[in-house]
Amino acid sequence: MNKIKSMLSVYFIAGSQDCRHLPGSPVENLLNILQQALEAGITCFQFREKGERSLAQNPQLKHRLALQCQQLCRQFNVPFIINDDIGLALAIRADGIHVGQKDTAVERILSRADYRPIIGLSINTLEQAQANKERLGIDYFGIGPIFATQSKADHAPAVGMEFIRQIHELGIDKPCVAIGGIHEDNTAEIRRLGANGVAVISAITRSNDIARTVQNLACHS
């Protein structure tokens, strides 16, 4: 469990769709940002190629980009997680898979895998947390969105920082990473309330100084 908690400290999530605000190729921009983030010290990367203007409709390009991101993560010994796409994750033997409440069932992932991937589950209500706190196969919770966010078009309602404290008051000790509207200025309070880490998209993809941003996200861990 301690290994999972450490992994969650500075958890970067991105796909090429998150890099279209920059000039040039979104794919090359993602790889460049990921390289800088890895050099700066992120502890986990989730490949989330999903939504409008992503490569979701082009499986070959998505597969190629996933392999490139995985290769970078391996160079830095950082876990490489894939969002929801179980076929891709198992085909390239990703370190882990992250799923939402409406995505692929955890039991299906475990039955199909010939190795034990790390599995994360998104949580947005206390009822979901209670129902899954002792469920076999789930290694950590992604809780949120803590604040409203524009990085995900289909996000659930924001739950607020107190949600983190409420989870711990219920005696739920599953490792958890907070996501949604998180930036350098609110990281300390989120960790103080009990989150093992912070997950960010735009805080890094839109940063003017990725090294400084990652350092600030990690400084209270």
UniProtKB/Swiss-Prot annotation:
<feature type="binding site">
    <location>
        <begin position="201"/>
        <end position="202"/>
    </location>
    <ligand>
        <name>2-[(2R,5Z)-2-carboxy-4-methylthiazol-5(2H)-ylidene]ethyl phosphate</name>
    </ligand>
</feature>
<feature type="binding site">
    <location>
        <position position="181"/>
    </location>
    <ligand>
        <name>2-[(2R,5Z)-2-carboxy-4-methylthiazol-5(2H)-ylidene]ethyl phosphate</name>
    </ligand>
</feature>
<dbReference type="InterPro" id="IPR022998">
    <property type="entry name" value="ThiamineP_synth_TenI"/>
</dbReference>
<feature type="binding site">
    <location>
        <begin position="149"/>
        <end position="151"/>
    </location>
    <ligand>
        <name>2-[(2R,5Z)-2-carboxy-4-methylthiazol-5(2H)-ylidene]ethyl phosphate</name>
    </ligand>
</feature>
<comment type="similarity">
    <text>Belongs to the thiamine-phosphate synthase family.</text>
</comment>
<feature type="binding site">
    <location>
        <position position="103"/>
    </location>
    <ligand>
        <name>Mg(2+)</name>
    </ligand>
</feature>
<comment type="function">
    <text>Condenses 4-methyl-5-(beta-hydroxyethyl)thiazole monophosphate (THZ-P) and 2-methyl-4-amino-5-hydroxymethyl pyrimidine pyrophosphate (HMP-PP) to form thiamine monophosphate (TMP).</text>
</comment>
<feature type="binding site">
    <location>
        <position position="122"/>
    </location>
    <ligand>
        <name>4-amino-2-methyl-5-(diphosphooxymethyl)pyrimidine</name>
    </ligand>
</feature>
<dbReference type="GO" id="GO:0005737">
    <property type="term" value="C:cytoplasm"/>
</dbReference>
<protein>
    <recommendedName>
        <fullName>Thiamine-phosphate synthase</fullName>
        <ecNumber>2.5.1.3</ecNumber>
    </recommendedName>
</protein>
<dbReference type="GO" id="GO:0000287">
    <property type="term" value="F:magnesium ion binding"/>
</dbReference>
<dbReference type="InterPro" id="IPR013785">
    <property type="entry name" value="Aldolase_TIM"/>
</dbReference>
<dbReference type="GO" id="GO:0009229">
    <property type="term" value="P:thiamine diphosphate biosynthetic process"/>
</dbReference>
<dbReference type="InterPro" id="IPR034291">
    <property type="entry name" value="TMP_synthase"/>
</dbReference>
<dbReference type="GO" id="GO:0004789">
    <property type="term" value="F:thiamine-phosphate diphosphorylase activity"/>
</dbReference>
<dbReference type="GO" id="GO:0009228">
    <property type="term" value="P:thiamine biosynthetic process"/>
</dbReference>
<keyword id="KW-0479">Metal-binding</keyword>
<keyword id="KW-0784">Thiamine biosynthesis</keyword>
<comment type="pathway">
    <text>Cofactor biosynthesis; thiamine diphosphate biosynthesis; thiamine phosphate from 4-amino-2-methyl-5-diphosphomethylpyrimidine and 4-methyl-5-(2-phosphoethyl)-thiazole: step 1/1.</text>
</comment>
<feature type="binding site">
    <location>
        <position position="152"/>
    </location>
    <ligand>
        <name>4-amino-2-methyl-5-(diphosphooxymethyl)pyrimidine</name>
    </ligand>
</feature>
<feature type="binding site">
    <location>
        <position position="84"/>
    </location>
    <ligand>
        <name>Mg(2+)</name>
    </ligand>
</feature>
<feature type="binding site">
    <location>
        <position position="83"/>
    </location>
    <ligand>
        <name>4-amino-2-methyl-5-(diphosphooxymethyl)pyrimidine</name>
    </ligand>
</feature>
<keyword id="KW-0808">Transferase</keyword>
<dbReference type="Pfam" id="PF02581">
    <property type="entry name" value="TMP-TENI"/>
</dbReference>
<feature type="binding site">
    <location>
        <begin position="46"/>
        <end position="50"/>
    </location>
    <ligand>
        <name>4-amino-2-methyl-5-(diphosphooxymethyl)pyrimidine</name>
    </ligand>
</feature>
<dbReference type="InterPro" id="IPR036206">
    <property type="entry name" value="ThiamineP_synth_sf"/>
</dbReference>
<keyword id="KW-0460">Magnesium</keyword>
